[in-house]
Amino acid sequence: MSGIGRTRSITLAGLRGEVVHVEADIAQSLPGFTLLGLPDQALQESRDRIRSAARNAGLPLTRRHLTVNLLPAGVHKRGACHDLAIVLAAYAADGRVRNVEGPVFLAELGLDGALHLSLIHI
């Protein structure tokens, strides 16, 4: 059963941290991965990094179309620190994990699925 998966991360807005709400939706259409919400280049690259990490960790993402929205839409999101929040939102949308809406997730994923400390960039 699919629905909307939700998690949270953090980005810098000027000199203050701002909570990023991560929403994931899985559609019954051709495979793909759309990332919305003013992501920078490193975050755009997370689509391939997250798919590879999930597959190599033995927990592949859905083969359907995944849309991820990062809110608030008007705030630029920087860096790979949102990887973990995105993959957990995708798993929640697919019904594979529960209770991930409360915590803030802040980590980069390696291609092997390992978690890496990821600093928030100004």
Where are these regions (language model features)?
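Peripheral, non-AAA+ core regions of ATP-driven protein-machinery
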Residues: 1-121
